[in-house]
Every structure is written in structure tokens, then in C-alpha cells.
Amino acid sequence: MASNHPAQSRLYVDAHLDLAYNAVRGRDLTLSVDKLRAKEKRDNQEIMATLPELSQGGVRLVFATIFVMPRKYAPADAPESFTYEGAQEAHERAVEQLELYQRWEAQGRITIIRSARDLERHLESTRTAPAGDGPGHAPVGVVLLMEGADPVRTPEELGWWWEQGIRIVGLSWKETRYAGGTGVPGPLTDLGRQLLTQMQQLGMALDVSHLAPESFWQAVEGWSGPLLASHSNSRAFVDSDRHLDDEMVRALAQRDAMIGLVLANPFLKAGVSRQDPKSSVTLADVGAQARHIAAIAGWERVGIGSDFDGGFGLQETPQGLERAGDFHKLAGAFPEEAVQGVLATNWLRWLRASLPNQ
């Protein structure tokens, strides 16, 4: 069977994928996209990203999340084993995902990137190892990102998560004990301020995606460490507190933060819902988002944080994207001189400046 991927001469970087969350819910991410789609037989939210797909498509560096869903915000049919109520349950669910990443690393499927030295070693290995999955093939480099900090039972526990390889933390998804979040306005809590202090002492990066506006400004104004919005679009296109307004983008740029564009149709174009045809949004709409943010922050601070399979799938992504390995098709959405930066090197620059040396 012919390959779905052209020959890849570049490495691509995706700054937001919920790999473990999907896997613990029963999606076998060690399969190819075609095999998993055939196995699942879905007519919506068809899978976009699996480990072989990422490697074969050249997306060999990703920010992979530890994400657990608060039970009170979960769909009614969500099994309790995938959700949490309280810090202890959040911790247990998150450790399950952490252990999955550790197993994948032991199997040679991924490499967890803990330092700038690890990053350079991984980049060198991708130049020689063949695409694929498992021993002898190019593993996917993974920077671990905690999306929603409730699994951290106390701020003092954060050091343990650092030792496990977590390098980026976002305080909220909806609300957490630490901060207000998407659709749930609120400030930083006292615990949130304590957590930010611990993060800065450890050298962790702060992900502001999903922070409620009040929490965003309180966090950013007192923050001096590495900063990013791993998966956020412009509020100028879709007016929701899920996205960044121009003043937020400007504040992030002043702190040399990166912004990763989400490739979900309802987040890219006003008036588009999950039920609308895939063709409702095109790669030109991705380009429009990128140009708006770049006009404020500069192209050097624009990247991709696709969030593929983060509650949406094939049917809810722009026309022309069929799988995670289609990253190369995004090139046409950006000015030629910006393509390499947006698809890879901007994130690499940020990581080299943000990760511990060793």
C-alpha cells in the first residue's frame, strides 16, 4: 500500500497533544491512523494522531499532556475512571498517564525530553533513524505538559512532578484549585500564587492557555520564567474567553512567549460549529489567524499547538488536513519566509531557552 506521507526532510513540532488521555480511554495509539480508524469505526472525532503517524509524518517533537477532566464538567456518559473529584483522584488519574508515557519510553516509542541536552540528542537521532514506531525507528520526542494543575495535591509536591519530567504546567482547564479557567471566570487563588512561586524556583514553564482573563493577567504580571500559550487562537476571530485578545498577545510577546495555534475549526473561524462540514474552514483560515498574531507578536513567536484529538477529530479540522502527518500541508498557509519557524524552529528556539541545560 502506498504511504500516506511524502518523504520528510524536516522535523515538525506540535506543542499540544493529549496522547495519554486518549490512550487511557482505550484508543491504541501504537497503531497507525488507518488501522485505528478501521478498528474504531467512528463517524465523528476520527483519530488524527498516533505514535507511528507522528513519526512517519515528521512530527517527531510534541508537547504531550497529562490532562484529567473534572467530573463536574465531564459529559454525562463519561466513565468516572476517566474523571476526578478532588485533588487525590486528580493525582491518581494523572499518575496513570505519567506511567503510560514512561512505558512508551521504555518500549522505544517516545523519548521524554527533560533538558536542552536531551533535546539536542533527540534532534540528532531523528536525522538518522528511519520513520516508524518501536525499536530501531525514530521515536517521538515528548515534552511533558500538565494541563490543569489539580493533580498537584499541594504546591510543595511540584518538585516530585519535576523529577518525573514535567517541564510545563498550565494552571487550569475549567477552574481548578489554582485559578479560574475557560468558561469559569476567577482569579488566581492563594494556592495558585504559591504554585507559581514553586514553578519559578524549579524552572518550569507556565502555559497560559485556558486561563480565565483575570487569572491570566495576575499570573503574567508577576511571572519571570519561561512562558507560552501552547494552544490558543486569536479572540479577534472567535470571541470567547478560550482565546487571546490582542492585549494578551502583546503582553506575551513582550515576555518572548510562544503562541501555538489550535487546528480546531470552531476555534479558527467565527460562526463555525462542530456539526458544520469540514470544508467550512480551510488552511487559509489558519493563515489568517497566524498573520493576525504575527502582526502583534512577530512571526518568530507563532507556532502550532494543534490539540488534535482533544475533543475533536478529523471532521472538525480544516479542509486539507486528514491526519497529524499532514503538517507539511500547513506550509501554504504562511509566508514562505515564516514557514520553517512556525512549523518547527520557533518552538526549538523557545525550548533551548526554556529547558534546563541538563
What does each model-found stretch correspond to?
Residues 204, 225, 257:
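A short helix->loop->beta-strand "cap" motif at the edges of active sites that frequently abuts
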Residues 212-214, 220-221, 226-240, 244-253:
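Acidic, glycine-rich loop-and-beta core segments that form the ion-binding/anion-interacting portion
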Residues 185-220, 229-231:
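Loop-centered beta-sheet repeat module
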Residues 1-190, 239-358:
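N-terminal hydrophobic targeting/anchoring segments and the immediately downstream early-domain regions
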